Design a protein with these regions (language model features):
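Structural motif
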Residues: 30-47
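Hydrophobic beta-strand segments
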Residues: 50-54, 67, 82, 122
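Short, acidic Ser/Thr/Gly-rich low-complexity loop/linker segments typical of extracellular
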Residues: 58-68
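Short strand-edge motifs at loop-to-beta-strand transitions and within beta-strands
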Residues: 69-71, 104-106
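Short Pro-Gly-centered beta-turn/loop motif in secreted/extracellular proteins
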Residues: 71-78
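A short, solvent-exposed loop/turn motif at the edges and junctions
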Residues: 83-94
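Surface-exposed, low-complexity/disordered segments
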Residues: 105-237, 248-251, 300-301, 305-418
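Extended beta-strand-rich segments in extracellular/periplasmic secretory proteins, especially
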Residues: 225-275, 280-288, 322-323
């Protein structure tokens, strides 16, 4: 069958456009599944991307766009406590117990922090100096050991409001100590995956993301000083103190940054959320400067068909970190790109949204002996093209994932019926 799709290739924070040792739970280990919704107690609206952690373990996940989560916990870890934290809300905890062998429904309500952050403004300080001090304290505040994470990865592409690509993976991520702000020796290995694609013949343009599962290495803004900026490049940015925020019941500075110099490539603006006590960077939000669309296009677009106009709209992301026993670890990453495509001499264009996210679901101290180079996933590989190599019919079994949102689940069910 002839493939008439045109293909666009994009890197993690770039695109490709065409014409069209994982850490599983032991099989003998009993799991208890806890699931439910997390909502704002004031307006009863769901809260997405809430970080959930089972205390006493390295098990965790995040809520989906509907505020829903499910978490599989080994029975021998119970009783314990589930902790939920999100920026701007008071952290909450709820006991988890082993009352039966069935799944448990746990619905939680979180309270906005309101005006409890006035102490941060009393602290004051120069925002630039605070950021510089936080960068210098990275070796002290973050893991000093090799860590092997288990993670769940999902990438999606939408044409307008319709999903045309959904790919998911269970991954291993090897992270090196944070005493050096580089990515040397860090690796990603895919354990299993699955893909769902729209079969519509009208989808004449296919969007492919390069290096998607590699994002915990490239987009770790604390570890990778080439992503945003290093201490030596701090003079290239303007910093401003914004209203503070509460994260995990700890007061945080919110310091925005934007470039004040012009480079041959586009720079980022964004916000650092820095612990007011120990200067740990708990959250980073970033967005690529879109003033020079040509620079942005050169930065993110790897390949496209001739005759196709590509217009970037948004390149943004967020990275969060979780503190356990005094050290912070990578927790969640989300990267989003929006752009328009149209063929020359045609009146209408289509808007595409490419999104990739990964949550770290468990962690152990490890060394690099179990991850061979030939088994790793590189920054230039296209996961959606290779996902079938990792297919497993028991994809969901015994693993913690980001539950699909209602709109995503509907898209999946619709594709399955065709």
């Amino acid at each position: 069958m002839k493939n008439n799709q045109n293909i666009i290739y994009i890197r993690i924070l770039s695109l490709l456009i065409f014409s069209f040792w994982f850490l599983p739970v032991s099989a003998s280990e009993q799991l208890i599944e806890f699931s439910g919704y997390i909502k704002n107690i004031k307006n009863k609206k769901p809260i997405d991307n809430v970080s959930l952690t089972v205390e006493g373990t390295n098990i965790g996940t995040v809520t989906n766009d509907d505020g829903y989560f499910s978490l599989k916990v080994p029975a021998n870890s119970l009783p314990t406590v589930l902790k939920a934290e999100y920026i701007g809300f008071q952290t909450i905890t709820i006991p988890l117990s082993l009352k039966s062998n069935r799944s448990k429904i746990v619905n939680l309500f979180m309270t906005p922090t309101g005006k409890v952050l006035k102490e941060l403004f009393v602290l004051g300080g120069d925002p630039k100096e605070i950021v510089e001090a936080a960068l210098k304290k990275i070796p002290e505040n973050y893991s000093a050991n090799d860590n092997l994470f288990s993670g769940f990865y999902r990438e999606t592409v939408k044409k307008g409001n319709r999903y045309i690509n959904i790919s998911e993976a269970l991954v291993d991520v090897l992270k090196k100590p944070y005493k050096h702000r580089n990515t040397f020796g860090e690796k990603v290995k895919i354990d299993r995956g699955r893909k769902l694609l729209s079969p519509k013949p009208s989808d004449t343009i296919a969007v492919k993301l390069m290096g998607g599962p590699y994002m915990p290495i490239v987009l770790d803004a604390v570890k990778n000083d080439e992503h945003l900026f290093s201490i030596d490049e701090i003079e290239n940015y303007e910093f401003k103190m914004e209203p503070g925020a509460l994260i995990d019941d700890r007061m945080h500075y919110a310091i925005s940054f934007k470039p004040i110099v012009t480079m041959p490539y586009p720079l980022y603006s964004g916000v650092f959320y820095i612990d007011g006590d120990n200067l740990t960077i708990s959250r980073v939000e970033f967005e690529l400067d879109m003033k020079d669309k040509k620079k942005v296009t050169n930065s993110i677009l790897q390949k496209k068909p001739s005759g196709l106009n590509f217009k970037p709209i948004e390149v943004s992301g967020v990275v969060t970190y979780k503190t356990i026993n005094g050290k912070s670890y990578l927790d969640y990453i989300n990267s989003k790109m929006r752009f328009k495509c149209d063929w020359k001499k045609r009146l209408f264009s289509s808007t595409y949204t490419s999104q990739a996210e990964m949550v770290m679901t468990s962690r152990t101290d490890s060394i690099d002996r179990h991850m061979k180079f030939n088994d790793t996933f590189g920054s230039r590989k296209i996961f959606s093209d290779q996902v079938d190599n990792y297919w497993d019919e028991n994809f969901w079994k015994d693993y913690n994932i980001i539950e699909p949102s209602e709109s995503l689940e509907k898209a999946v069910n619709k594709l399955r019926k065709k």
